[in-house]
Amino acid sequence: RLTDTFRVIGVDLRGHGGSDPPPSRAGLRYEPMAADVLAVLDALGIEEFSAVGESLGGGVSAVVDELRPGAMRRLVCCEGIAFDATAFPRGASPGEGGASGNFMADIARARRAVWPDREAVRARYAGRPPFDVVAPEALAGYLRWGFVDRPDGQVELACDPETEAAIFEVTSEPGGADRAFAHLAAMRGRVAVLRGEASYLPEPWFRAQADAAGTELRTIPGGHFFLQEDTARAEAIVRAELGR
């Protein structure tokens, strides 16, 4: 939908999609992930670009700008994981609590990794949050790229549960979401901050992002994955925010 105007590049961050997980937990911090993005852009000969970053991608995109000042024209940060943990009282920051101290990590570790086939995944996921509200083409894309084929004929999550759990933990530690948040002030005038109206993440988190970046907070109908809930709306958002 956007290729008439943009050269669209999608990067699988470490441990996601076709990218291998790093050998150590430290490799899941934002800086090495951002360095990977720059390595891809260098390999493609791209010197200037705009970014649309959702969730983890929003936070990592801010660090991409930090590592290479002047290369990123604009960032559309959608429910970005970029926050100053000290701004929230204990228990208010998403991720706290649970047996490991991070309930999102606990959920990730309990996630079923291996399924008989993609249709079995579809049957299970389509009626459960958050996939019960995403567009059919978004779910189809996740089934295609979010799972890998196994030699035994089954399919397995491309981002294994332990890697996903470690990412949730690392984002709340130094070098994670705080690193991205600290750079937002340097991006004033070049960032759009968007949140989902029904997001499970707190509105003050994103208002703090917008304040740091010197912009207005824009609230979009939908949840954390509002981009995937309505493809036509997502296209319109990107075109409007990037001015094309």
Question: Residue spans of the language-model regions?
Answer:
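Active-site loop/oxyanion-hole signature of alpha/beta-hydrolase fold enzymes
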Residues: 3, 9-52, 56, 88, ...
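Structural signature of beta-strand start/N-cap positions in the alpha/beta core
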Residues: 5-7, 47-50, 71-74, 190-192, ...
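Alpha/beta-hydrolase active-site loop signature
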Residues: 13-17, 82, 223-226
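Helix-rich cap/lid subdomain of alpha/beta-hydrolase
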Residues: 85-158, 172-174
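Conserved serine/cysteine hydrolase catalytic core
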Residues: 137, 147-210
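Catalytic histidine neighborhood in serine/cysteine hydrolases
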Residues: 211-224
